[in-house]
Amino acid sequence: ETVQGAMVVMDYNGRVLGLVGGTGKKKVNLGLNRATMSKRQPGSTIKPLSVYGPALEKSLQDENTNIYWSTMIKDAPLKVVDGKPWPTNQGGGYSGSTVTLQYGLAQSKNTISARTLDMISDAGAVDYSLDFISNRFHISTLDSVKDCDYAPMATGGVTNGVTVLEMTAAYATFGNGGYYYEPYCYTKIEDVQGNVVLQKQPEKTKESALSENTAWVMNKLLQTVMTAGTGTSYKLSGIQCFGKTGTTTDDKDR
């Protein structure tokens, strides 16, 4: 079976610098572009967007929410679902010990993301999370009913999946002070006389998704993923990296 993949390279102002829609050479016109069209399960890559970023931001705005990089959280299931503890971590286990939020994110602990989400002060934590990722990070493929639950928001088991392009644009906010830019693939279009017919103005799509403080903390947390967490095998030598790993059922998506 052929393994497929997709990639988007984008600068911090939304300009798409490179895009790969699948492995191998292009064989057809208007074929499937997996980077922009395929909706795949995000797994744990959703956690910074649906849990950690929103939780840190909430702590700046709500005195009843106190969630920080150093917050101590128990590595244990949050609740019992159908007679079974939920969630468990990769491999089905949990330690029962107390760890920092930073460690839980770096090691991609499902228990920590679920408990962090539950710590958001008001009863509508899941609604807050879904609204944040949909309207601040512009992930457009989420189901407003089916994905408004702990499993989709805390562990990434969403209904329809997400695209690589939208995830790239969302993650860029952690590296540019919290600003979201709509991704674009052109700068301008001219007619045969050289008249500008269409010109992209990225600043018009600029929105504040996160405070500068939250973006800075998230950047540092995601650097830990690459230096001392699940992403150590993927870091680039000599380049400061931040990122997040994600794996779905039976390793179908990574």
Task: Label each residue range with its predicted role.
Residues 29, 33, 52, 70, ...:
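Extracytoplasmic/secreted envelope proteins and their assembly/folding machinery
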Residues 60-127, 192-219, 223-224:
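Conserved catalytic neighborhood of penicillin-recognizing serine enzymes
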Residues 6-13, 38-46, 93, 97, ...:
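Secondary-structure capping and boundary motifs in well-ordered enzyme cores
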Residues 9-25, 57-59, 78, 97, ...:
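Glycine-rich, acidic and aromatic/proline-enriched surface loops and short helix-turn segments
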Residues 85-89, 121-168:
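Mid-domain, small-residue-enriched loop/turn segments at the edges of structured enzyme/sensor domains
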Residues 74, 115, 157, 243-245:
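Thr-Gly-centered strand-to-loop micro-motif
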Residues 1-9, 18-19, 25-38, 65-66, ...:
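A penicillin-recognizing enzyme superfamily signal
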Residues 14, 41-73, 104, 170-174, ...:
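Active-site SXXK
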